[in-house]
């Protein structure tokens, strides 16, 4: 559906039914698949034929939805994972091994910060975190001979910093490595990182893509633009024979358009099994079909709430890149001219105690670890999503102890503002 608009792709990309076939994508609720001969199945295990042999690796329902997300992001191949964290781990681990090094923005989701700084460190993979506001010189200084990937979030959770995608892509490519961008918050409706130089895009589909808090999942999209063979010395996993698949070399057999996702699916899914269930993929697709209609409402509500909070005397500061006073406003206008997302973070005067009292008195907004839902929700990141960080790391990530993150849903903005106003009135 290359010639159609993004709005149409949200509804129809990824699945084209034949004569007499289901109009909605079918849920293939089966762990395995039948073949007439051992030879037919053997070709699948040798990656000599396309098809399905076990849902731990692939499933038709998942592939329909992955194809839609690839079309929305402008990529050549995509896959679904069991969660956004699985997507980020697979995207990095697919090209990193013991001794590898990652350059990452310091302003990212706490779980991803922990994944890179702690869990992957136990695997022998080191990382250098840089401020998204760093100069080009500071960014380039973070690389070393073992750097294999650069990672950042389009809009960081929860500090709402905006990644200068072109700056990070330029540095990554100058050092012969890909840029991986988590595009969860804006979704491809509001930003397509591949168009700005990103090579791999990840998503927590649990958030705006599903949009209803119904299905946990993740996705990885490959732009098909990074030339792995041109940097074969850095990526032996893609550019040298894989003994677990009879000596296949992914970059040679599948080219730069298909090597990354094929290896990720056939090797990492086989060994680690972080597959999204077909039922969750089906639910995700229902969310995707209305994504282009829902996202503007989230942005409208986020903008209205941010403007209200910015003027309130009990609010210390507001993070929202749609505000003209925000330091990321110009970057947001460049990369997301139609708006970013419905998530706003702000600090109430009085610190953590005031923040907790404010949240306790909200009526519409529930305290949840979730974000990007049809229903408005909030939390204090320092005591929840980012509680594994120490005070220094919190400040580096732009997360003071009294910060409140509010995810504006699809309710009427006047009701949301009234709820915020009455809750703020309870804070002395």
Provide a role label for each language-model segment.
Residues 32, 223-226, 348-353:
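Short loop segments at secondary-structure junctions
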Residues 37-89, 111-119:
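Conserved N-terminal alpha-helix of the aminotransferase class I/II PLP-enzyme fold
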Residues 117, 126-127, 141, 145-148, ...:
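PLP-dependent enzyme catalytic core of the Aspartate aminotransferase-like
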Residues 272-275, 279-281, 286-290, 295-297, ...:
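Conserved small-domain helix->loop->beta segment predominantly found in fold-type I
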